[in-house]
Amino acid sequence: MSEILEDAIKSKAWPFEEAKKILDSLNGKTPEKGYVLFETGYGPSGLPHIGTFGENARMVMVQKAFEQLSNIKTKLICFSDDMDGLRKVPSNIPNPEMVAGYMDMPLTSIPDPFGECESYGHYMNAKLRSFLDKFGFEYEFYSSTEMYKAGMFDEMLIRVLEKYDEIMELMLPTFREERKATYSPFMPICPKTGKVLQVPIHKWDAKLGTITYKDENGETIEVPVTKGHCKLQWKPDFSMRWAALKVDYEMYGKDHLANGRLYSEICRILGGKPPVQLCYELFLDENGEKISKSKGNSISVDDWLKYAPVESMALFMYQNPTRAKRLFFDVIPKNVDEYITFNQKYHLEEDRTKRFANPVYHIHHGNVPKIETFGITYSLLLNLTSVCNPSDKSVLWGFISRYEPKAMPNNSPYLDHLAEFAIRYYNDFVKAHKSYLAPSEKHKAILQDILDMLKGLPEQIEAESIQKGIYDIGMKAGYENLRDYFKDLYQILLGQSDGPRLGTFIKLYGISETMKLIEEKL
């Protein structure tokens, strides 16, 4: 065994931990189908949100970790539940009145309200695929509609008929009395209306491959369960897919957690082997509510990428997948700066075990680019933007180049992009919410002390020396907690309650410019 493989096996990074579970479930052997199958699912009832990206990003992290631990081939599929009936009209789509006329119709049978694709479902699928393609995910796309209609699930659907009673024994105890009376694993597609029906099944015949039910007019209808004439309820459908496709690894959100045992049991009843599963926590919006595609109460992928590099979004997805996290615009600067820190640590680290534990290793699948920001963070750029209110990034570069003469847009593309992102973020989220503190007499005395200290400093002084000077003034200012001292300075000078290390900020902004800023406050 190579040293690299030994270090990967010893790694406690969660993608390696998940990969080891998969390898153990296979006893280290290649499955009969010749590859290990990773599956992600997508419900195209609304526009793809950042959680959809997150599931695929995390899945690929595990897939790549597995490939490092073994020589077994892998495949990733993205499965779209586009045959589901529409249950409610999303609030963030055009022509909602038109869509409302197609309730309970399969998503691929509803006209596209955007007017671009052959159906609502096709449009949503195209949106998903476009951003998966944009980020270089290697996957195969599976459509529920196409799979059902092409007969790819026919064998398993007949088996559901054969095991009907066993499946019902598992399912019925999970429902209230009124639902027990109407539940069936099968949902026929009405031959007259095309709707996905949730109706009681009065007869089922595994030999004929049919079910019998009464439609809304009381007419007895017999339909085959094959070739797209029926689809399964979502819980049995999940299990059937695992058995039919021989899925080896699946992730799902906490809203599925209570059903994990059911999925696995039904999969076994159908003759399949349940995959290794990871249940991840759901993202919450700024109010602590679950984000939703149909509500549109989340940050979209496009939103994030308007203000930050994709690596920062991938870092957000990597961190603590089993812990609930609030997802709103305030998290963007923090994740950009954390990515910069992790990237720098990775390239300074010689211990391979520690490199394997670094999030950037998994974000970039072991091929981590080296970025250079010359000690300038996204937060620092936001604060610089706050005081100089630039019309474009060239203004910021004037300060950056003076701070670090080696830094130029052409040799620091990452920093160049950050400057552009910072201006956008400041204009959209910070500018309107700035609230300056009017300095008291005590504050004015402190500001005068800082001004006097700065007057005696050369422009080439180190940021740490400036920081020490400000710190020493704070120690003499009579604050019980120095945190309150710095908070007051941030509110007076920057109009916000927190901020950067002032020494670094002053070095970047310039001593003379900072003196002018302080004089304005006096």
Swiss-Prot record:
Motif extent ('HIGH' region): 44-52
Assigned EC number: 6.1.1.6
Main location: cytoplasm
Binding, ATP: K293
Key words of the record: Aminoacyl-tRNA synthetase, ATP-binding, Cytoplasm, Ligase, Nucleotide-binding, Protein biosynthesis
Signal peptide: none
InterPro entries from the UniProt entry: aa-tRNA-synth_I_codon-bd_sub2, aa-tRNA-synth_I_CS, aa_tRNA-synth_I_cd-bd_sf, Lys-tRNA-ligase, Rossmann-like_a/b/a_fold
Disulphide bond pairs: none
A single GO BP: lysyl-tRNA aminoacylation
Subcellular location: Cytoplasm
Short motif 'KMSKS' region, span: 290-294
Keyword Metal-binding: no
GO molecular function ontology, one term from the record: lysine-tRNA ligase activity
GO cellular component: cytoplasm
Keyword Aminoacyl-tRNA synthetase: yes
PANTHER family according to UniProt: LYSINE--TRNA LIGASE
NCBIfam families for the chain: lysS_arch, PRK00750.1-2
Listed name of the protein: Lysine--tRNA ligase
Organism listed in the record: Rickettsia bellii (strain OSU 85-389)
